[in-house]
């Protein structure tokens, strides 16, 4: 094991950086902070734990990480600004050019990145953004928070998560500016949480009408606070023989949900198509996970978005067992079961079980689902669309952070848990799409024509 980093305890601090012994990731963080003159604030009362083993632990609080950098002996005066680096490079190039003819392949004329600069992005999940004003916890604001103006060099970066994060709030020194008319949603006397809360309760009410026998009077009385479309008594056993995937009414419900997303109407036609398709996949995974956590986890039942359930204790056979065929009456049933059940088992093991352990509240679920949609769509949008995506993600992450740092909210560890869960949720959504493509290609399902169109869309 190598020498430990004085900041995050990584056993890779083989040399000194800026006067202190630290790893390349912490050195890159320190250099970027000083060079860009970034300011942070810690929302916790006690020093936050900074550790290399988990990315969320290393990045959970930039203010505390910066303090540890200074405690390790790192000095800001040893960090050269980008302007100084450019001047040095230009002088070096001029000297090289005076000694030899220019060579387009020579190191002096190529833009290169040092290992530390490369490490800067490989270890970073979230880019620093200029600070927005603190987002309110109470849903009694007259307008949603406006995004801040991004630095040009920062807005062009595209790391896996390039929004603000957790307890490190961006600096308030940056001036805020309103977006063009129609770019931001304008819901008076409503907060961002209320907005996504209303979207989700509306979707729950539609599913309750569609898939249960609940009276309309009850639905009208409870729709504003409906957090799950089903009760345990509403659930029906899943029948793979009649399963057709998503049907037309499912797409209608999600269409209404999608069009209510902030800035959706400002997307191009291609971006709207992309955004809607991502919502369909993310909703199936995340809503199933949430409904299961609320209704089926105690009975080890996987609850689907249409109110059907599958018993998962013990796990059903996948259909790939040696003697699996003898349990089915015909080859058609066997083929359909073998195509569908591995997909459901994978969703259960890879997403629903770990998500259920988080014990998310309905408010956390509303924000996390919207954030997952924005993140899943980000790299499929144009640069203009990505800018809108970054803006909306920053608003959600900022509010989620404030909510988790309220009394009893769990603090930075809770924020880290929720944000890290997006990794396996997005992966399951991608696998779900791939599985449906295969099911339609081989005509395993008698799918709705809308589902065929969704799966044939060219990204």
Curated annotation (Swiss-Prot):
<dbReference type="InterPro" id="IPR001628">
    <property type="entry name" value="Znf_hrmn_rcpt"/>
</dbReference>
<feature type="region of interest" description="Disordered">
    <location>
        <begin position="90"/>
        <end position="119"/>
    </location>
</feature>
<dbReference type="InterPro" id="IPR000536">
    <property type="entry name" value="Nucl_hrmn_rcpt_lig-bd"/>
</dbReference>
<feature type="zinc finger region" description="NR C4-type">
    <location>
        <begin position="42"/>
        <end position="69"/>
    </location>
</feature>
<feature type="DNA-binding region" description="Nuclear receptor">
    <location>
        <begin position="2"/>
        <end position="81"/>
    </location>
</feature>
<dbReference type="GO" id="GO:0008270">
    <property type="term" value="F:zinc ion binding"/>
</dbReference>
<dbReference type="Pfam" id="PF00105">
    <property type="entry name" value="zf-C4"/>
</dbReference>
<keyword id="KW-0804">Transcription</keyword>
<comment type="similarity">
    <text>Belongs to the nuclear hormone receptor family.</text>
</comment>
<keyword id="KW-0479">Metal-binding</keyword>
<protein>
    <recommendedName>
        <fullName>Nuclear hormone receptor family member nhr-11</fullName>
    </recommendedName>
</protein>
<keyword id="KW-0238">DNA-binding</keyword>
<dbReference type="InterPro" id="IPR001723">
    <property type="entry name" value="Nuclear_hrmn_rcpt"/>
</dbReference>
<comment type="function">
    <text>Orphan nuclear receptor.</text>
</comment>
<dbReference type="GO" id="GO:0005634">
    <property type="term" value="C:nucleus"/>
</dbReference>
<dbReference type="GO" id="GO:0043565">
    <property type="term" value="F:sequence-specific DNA binding"/>
</dbReference>
<dbReference type="InterPro" id="IPR013088">
    <property type="entry name" value="Znf_NHR/GATA"/>
</dbReference>
<keyword id="KW-0862">Zinc</keyword>
<keyword id="KW-0675">Receptor</keyword>
<feature type="compositionally biased region" description="Low complexity">
    <location>
        <begin position="97"/>
        <end position="115"/>
    </location>
</feature>
<feature type="domain" description="NR LBD">
    <location>
        <begin position="188"/>
        <end position="458"/>
    </location>
</feature>
<dbReference type="GO" id="GO:0003700">
    <property type="term" value="F:DNA-binding transcription factor activity"/>
</dbReference>
<dbReference type="Pfam" id="PF00104">
    <property type="entry name" value="Hormone_recep"/>
</dbReference>
<feature type="region of interest" description="Disordered">
    <location>
        <begin position="134"/>
        <end position="162"/>
    </location>
</feature>
<keyword id="KW-0539">Nucleus</keyword>
<dbReference type="InterPro" id="IPR035500">
    <property type="entry name" value="NHR-like_dom_sf"/>
</dbReference>
<feature type="zinc finger region" description="NR C4-type">
    <location>
        <begin position="5"/>
        <end position="26"/>
    </location>
</feature>
<keyword id="KW-0863">Zinc-finger</keyword>
<keyword id="KW-0805">Transcription regulation</keyword>
């Amino acid at each position: 094991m190598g020498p430990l980093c004085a900041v995050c305890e990584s056993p890779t601090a083989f040399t000194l950086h800026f006067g202190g012994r630290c790893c390349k990731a912490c050195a890159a963080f320190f250099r970027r902070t000083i060079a860009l003159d970034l300011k942070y604030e810690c929302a916790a009362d006690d020093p936050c734990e900074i550790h290399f083993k988990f990315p969320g632990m290393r990045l959970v609080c930039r203010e505390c990480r910066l303090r540890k950098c200074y405690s390790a002996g790192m000095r800001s005066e040893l960090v050269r600004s980008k302007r100084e680096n450019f001047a040095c490079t230009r002088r070096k190039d001029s000297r090289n050019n005076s000694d030899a003819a220019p060579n387009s392949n020579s190191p002096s004329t190529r833009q290169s990145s040092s290992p530390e600069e490369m490490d800067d992005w490989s270890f970073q999940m979230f880019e620093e953004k200029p600070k927005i004003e603190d987002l309110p916890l109470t849903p009694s604001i007259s307008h949603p928070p406006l995004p801040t103006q991004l630095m040009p060099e920062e807005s062009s970066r595209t790391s896996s998560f390039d929004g603000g994060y957790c307890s490190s709030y961006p600096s308030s020194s940056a001036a805020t500016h309103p977006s063009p008319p129609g770019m931001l949603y304008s819901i008076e006397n409503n907060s961002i949480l209320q907005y996504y809360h209303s979207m989700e309760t509306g979707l729950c009410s539609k599913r309750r009408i569609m898939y249960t026998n609940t009276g309309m009077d009850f639905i009208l009385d409870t729709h504003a606070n409906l957090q799950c479309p089903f009760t345990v008594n509403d659930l029906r056993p899943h029948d793979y023989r009649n399963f057709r995937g998503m049907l037309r009414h499912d797409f209608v419900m999600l269409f209404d949900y999608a069009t209510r997303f902030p800035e959706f109407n400002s997307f191009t036609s291609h971006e709207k198509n992309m955004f809607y398709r991502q919502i369909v996949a993310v909703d199936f995974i995340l809503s199933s996970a949430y409904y299961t956590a609320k209704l089926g986890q105690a009975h080890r039942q996987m609850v689907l978005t249409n109110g059907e359930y599958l018993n998962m204790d013990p796990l059903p056979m996948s259909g790939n067992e040696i003697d699996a065929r003898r349990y089915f009456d015909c080859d058609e049933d066997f083929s359909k079961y073998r195509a569908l059940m591995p997909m459901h088992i994978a969703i259960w093991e890879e997403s629903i079980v770990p998500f259920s352990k988080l014990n998310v509240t309905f408010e956390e679920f509303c924000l996390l689902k919207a954030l997952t949609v924005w993140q899943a769509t980000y790299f499929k949008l144009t640069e203009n669309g990505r800018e809108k995506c970054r803006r909306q993600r920053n608003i959600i992450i900022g509010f989620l952070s404030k909510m988790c740092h309220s009394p009893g909210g769990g603090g930075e560890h809770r924020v880290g848990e929720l944000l890290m869960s997006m990794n396996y949720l997005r992966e399951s959504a991608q696998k779900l799409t791939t599985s449906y493509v295969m099911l339609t290609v081989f005509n395993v399902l008698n799918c709705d024509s809308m589902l065929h169109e969704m799966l044939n869309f060219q990204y």
